[in-house]
Amino acid sequence: MATITREEIKEAIKSMTVLELAQLVKDLEEEFGVSAAAMVAAAPAAGGAAGAAAPAEEKTEFDVILTNAGANKINVIKVVREITGLGLKEAKDLVDGAPKPVKEGVSKDEAEQIKKKLEEAGATVEVK
């Protein structure tokens, strides 16, 4: 039996249609007694379909997004520097480039605290 490299397998898969890929998945599931659905659930950050299923679970990581600096931009820059540890130029660029994430992947409590600080400084903020 000839040995096929992983690269050759990847190239063959790239050339397949969606229907052929679906049939290949079914064949592999039957051959090895596994389920592709279990693999998708184990890696929710892998793609768009897995990301669509995630909202059913309670969210544990949040992104704090500065949508508008408001009229008191200097105070907002100071708060952004305090929260992120960025330098003056980087913090100013972040504030000037709004809407931009200030902090990503934080707990709900931390996200709410950051939002409160930024809003007290005059910024418009949303937590996603």
Swiss-Prot record:
GO CC field: cytosolic large ribosomal subunit
Pfam families for this protein: Ribosomal_L12 (PF00542), Ribosomal_L12_N (PF16320)
Keyword check for Ribosomal protein: yes
Keyword 4Fe-4S applies: no
InterPro entries from the UniProt entry: Ribosomal_bL12, Ribosomal_bL12_C, Ribosomal_bL12_C/ClpS-like, Ribosomal_bL12_oligo, Ribosomal_bL12_oligo_N_sf
GO biological process, one term: translation
A GO molecular-function descriptor: mRNA binding
SUPFAM superfamilies linked: ClpS-like (SSF54736), Ribosomal protein L7/12, oligomerisation (N-terminal) domain (SSF48300)
Cleavable signal peptide: none
Keywords: Ribonucleoprotein, Ribosomal protein
HAMAP family: Ribosomal_bL12
Chain's role: Forms part of the ribosomal stalk which helps the ribosome interact with GTP-bound translation factors. Is thus essential for accurate translation.
Quaternary structure and partners: Homodimer. Part of the ribosomal stalk of the 50S ribosomal subunit. Forms a multimeric L10(L12)X complex, where L10 forms an elongated spine to which 2 to 4 L12 dimers bind in a sequential fashion. Binds GTP-bound translation factors.
Family per record: Belongs to the bacterial ribosomal protein bL12 family.
Protein name: Large ribosomal subunit protein bL12
Species in which this protein is naturally found: Sulfurihydrogenibium sp. (strain YO3AOP1)
